[in-house]
Amino acid sequence: MIKRFLDYIAIEKRYSPRTVKEYGDDLRAWCAFLGWDIEDFDPKQLDAEDVKAWMLQMLEDGQSPRSVKRRLSAVKSLYRFLLGLGL
């Protein structure tokens, strides 16, 4: 599903290659935090507490608020895409 999302933002939304790469990196980091391979991503197993825990972990790891915001934006965009697919 994540690959499909990245293809969508690259082709349909015409995001820059750099943005697509960064979103891919952000979503891989999200999956790693969850302990999943990127291919194992299952949005139905997640909730807001998972996102909040990831955000707090990133801040504790010393990431800037700007970086955290961008990573959360990638996750939010992915979920918006999945909702549009009816998932």
Question: What are the language-model segments listed below?
Answer:
Residues 3-18, 24-87:
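N-terminal core-binding DNA-recognition domain of tyrosine recombinases/integrases
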